[in-house]
């Protein structure tokens, strides 16, 4: 099993971990109702996807 040769400082550890973060979900606006929605997903407000009615709006 691999073991580190030297102790890694808090500074180096935190610099490395600063890149390990969640990305924000990208939102687009629905072309029909202009509400924010996830891309490539049917709009939960009006129920359209690619200018077609695919689900009944809630």
Swiss-Prot record:
Gene Ontology cellular-component annotations: large ribosomal subunit
Keyword Ribosomal protein: yes
SUPFAM superfamilies: Zn-binding ribosomal proteins (SSF57829)
Any GO BP annotation: translation
Keywords from the UniProt entry: Ribonucleoprotein, Ribosomal protein
InterPro entries the record matches: Ribosomal_bL32, Ribosomal_bL32_bact, Ribosomal_zn-bd
GO molecular function, one term: structural constituent of ribosome
Keyword Cell membrane: no
Domain of life: Bacteria
HAMAP family named among the record's database cross-references: Ribosomal_bL32
Protein family (similarity comment): Belongs to the bacterial ribosomal protein bL32 family.
Protein name: Large ribosomal subunit protein bL32
Gene: rpmF
């Amino acid at each position: 099993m691999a073991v580190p040769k030297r102790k890694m400082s808090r500074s180096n550890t935190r610099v490395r971990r600063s890149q390990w973060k969640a990305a924000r979900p990208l939102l687009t606006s629905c072309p029909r109702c202009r509400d924010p929605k996830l891309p490539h997903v049917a709009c939960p407000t009006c129920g359209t996807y690619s200018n077609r009615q695919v689900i009944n709006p809630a």
